[in-house]
Structures are given as structure tokens and as C-alpha cells.
Design a protein with these regions (language model features):
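Charge-dense, helix-prone N-terminal extensions
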Residues: 1-124
């Protein structure tokens, strides 16, 4: 079961990430680009995810993943029930979302330093 504290610990370990409280949501971003957002009740995590892959992700585990809110459908974004995620899955989702908003050289350097295959796709 993942929590806001897990999101915070993972996200703030990623280069250039800053945390911001916007409204009641806790957001993690690089510069002005948000890549993760936790709802005020800490039940939902929104995160960057390729638009063309999100329907398949949601269909694969509908009890865990949800499409973005209608206002966010134009973005590369999807939502998850935070307590349904295990910490390792959360880590992979956040790293993948972060890689979408940082320069490719920074992402590649970080992934290499962590022994993560930059060619892997999605959780798992």
C-alpha cells in the first residue's frame, strides 16, 4: 500500500523535482511541468503517462487505474488509486512520469546511475 509519504520520498529523490501545494493537491514537478499529483484525501495519484497507452493500462487493472478527469484528457496523464499501488510499482510509475518532463540526458544519466534499463516500458 503506497502513501503520500512514499510518493514524496521517491519524487524528491529525482533530480530537479520540487514539491508544491496547489489548492489541496500535493504536486511534484520539474520546472513548471507537473509529473505527479496526490489528491487532498491522499487516495488518488495523477501522473504523467503516454496518452496512447493509458486506455490499455486502465483496462488491464481497472480497480487500480483510472482515466484522467475530462479536463485533463488532453494531457499525457492517468490516475491511480494510491493505496492499491505497491511501493515498487509506485517507484516505477513515478520514474517513468519524471522521465517525460526532464531533458533526455538527465533522465538517461539518472537511469544509468540506478541500474535501470532506459528501454523498459511502463510498470513491471
Amino acid at each position: 500500500m503506497a502513501t503520500l509519504d512514499d510518493v514524496r520520498r521517491i519524487a524528491l529523490s529525482l533530480p530537479r523535482t520540487t514539491e508544491h501545494l496547489v489548492g489541496d493537491n500535493t504536486r511534484f514537478r520539474v520546472g513548471r511541468l507537473v509529473y505527479a499529483s496526490v489528491s487532498a484525501d491522499e487516495e488518488r495519484l495523477g501522473f504523467g503517462f503516454p496518452k496512447e497507452e493509458r486506455a490499455a493500462l486502465v483496462a488491464s487493472e481497472p480497480a487500480k487505474f483510472m482515466m484522467p478527469l475530462p479536463a485533463d484528457e488532453r494531457y499525457q496523464w492517468v490516475r491511480a488509486r494510491l493505496p492499491a499501488l505497491d511501493p515498487e510499482e509506485l517507484r516505477e510509475l513515478l520514474i517513468d512520469a519524471w522521465c517525460m518532463v526532464v531533458p533526455k540526458t538527465i533522465a538517461a544519466r539518472y537511469l544509468e546511475s540506478q541500474g535501470i534499463d532506459p528501454g523498459r516500458t511502463g510498470p513491471g
